[in-house]
């Protein structure tokens, strides 16, 4: 059996190469083909190279962070299953899916044991965790631009990046409006501080976005917080951190299977830790199969 390993060697604390060596040592019967990303957004190029040789009897294993996986799945054919093991700094998809042991993933891959999950599909690509606008997108933007994340990852404190950038974003946020259509129902939401469309339970390095949000179900979970004075914004975020979602009057929640968003102007957003921008976007549920 051939196993194509697509790995991001720079994700998180740079452990991908070590895991590849462990796999080669533990599973000598497998023909391991290694493809390493060479820079930002190189996943599509590596997928294209893999697909030139890939057959239905082969397997794909992705090693990297949430962004590596979502960009790989954007290029990976829907009908082909995949396996995943986290080597990033946030690893929210792995936490939500309870992916912790590499040997369990490898056994599922070898035995062709797979499960159906749903990801979010959009013109900007596949989303495995959340699409965020407002506060959380600003946090990721600050973390990316500052270079602080790379420094802290080297000393295994990558998650601290988000806390420091969150404080900065709290003090310099921009409220926004959006027109929203959920399963054909349209409304305008004004003066937003935080807006997220979730496919999974966690985002932002382990913060629960919504308790029932799961990739195993065909559902989008929309979570948003309206703008308010600083003290109220802090309380709303604390409601998220301390899992008071249902009790909080500050956190709003809507579900659906198809969401269309229109913004008054081009706005920055983050998809699984990667930055983008748009003023119009449609998101739907897409079925995939994962070895687990």
List where the protein language model places each region.
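ATP/NTP phosphate-donor binding region
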Residues: 1-60, 70, 74
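Glycine-rich beta-alpha junction loops
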Residues: 9, 131-135, 198-201, 227
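Glycine-rich beta-strand-to-loop/alpha-helix junction loops that act as flexible
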Residues: 9, 63-65, 85-87
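Catalytic core of DAGKc-family lipid kinases
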Residues: 37, 79-83, 87-191
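Short, well-ordered alpha-helical microsegments
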Residues: 43-44, 68-70, 136, 278
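Glycine-rich phosphate/pyrophosphate-binding beta-alpha loops
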Residues: 132, 196-210, 275
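Gly/Ser/Thr-rich active-site loops/lids in small-molecule metabolic enzymes
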Residues: 148-160, 203-205, 211-231
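ATP/nucleoside-binding phosphotransfer catalytic cores, i.e., glycine-rich phosphate-binding loops
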Residues: 182-184, 189, 214-217, 221-292
């Amino acid at each position: 059996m051939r196993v194509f390993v697509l790995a991001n060697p720079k994700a998180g604390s740079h452990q991908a190469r070590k895991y590849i060596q462990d796999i080669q040592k533990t599973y000598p019967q497998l023909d391991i083909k290694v493809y390493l990303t060479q820079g930002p957004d190189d996943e599509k190029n590596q997928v294209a190279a893999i697909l030139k040789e890939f057959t239905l009897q082969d397997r794909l294993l992705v090693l990297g962070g949430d962004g590596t996986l979502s960009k790989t799945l954007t290029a990976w054919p829907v009908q082909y299953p995949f396996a995943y093991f986290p080597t990033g700094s946030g690893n929210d998809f792995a936490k939500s899916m309870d992916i912790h042991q590499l040997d369990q993933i490898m056994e599922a891959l070898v035995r062709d044991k797979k499960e159906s999950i749903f990801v979010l599909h959009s013109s900007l690509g596949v989303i495995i965790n959340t699409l965020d606008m407002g506060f959380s997108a600003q946090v990721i933007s600050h973390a990316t631009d500052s270079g602080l994340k790379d420094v802290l990852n080297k000393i295994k404190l990558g998650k601290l990046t988000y806390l420091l950038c969150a404080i900065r974003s709290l003090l310099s946020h921009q409220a926004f409006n959006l027109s929203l259509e959920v399963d054909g129902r349209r409304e305008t939401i004004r003066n937003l501080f935080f807006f997220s469309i979730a496919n999974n339970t966690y985002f932002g390095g382990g913060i629960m976005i919504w308790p029932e949000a799961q990739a195993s179900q065909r559902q989008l979970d929309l979570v948003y917080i309206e703008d308010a004075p600083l003290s109220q914004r802090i309380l709303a975020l604390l409601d998220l951190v301390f899992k008071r979602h249902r009790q909080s009057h500050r956190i709003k929640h809507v579900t659906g299977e198809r969401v269309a968003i229109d913004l008054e102007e081009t706005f920055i957003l983050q998809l699984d830790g990667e930055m983008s921008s748009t003023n119009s976007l449609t998101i739907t549920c897409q079925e995939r199969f994962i070895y687990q």
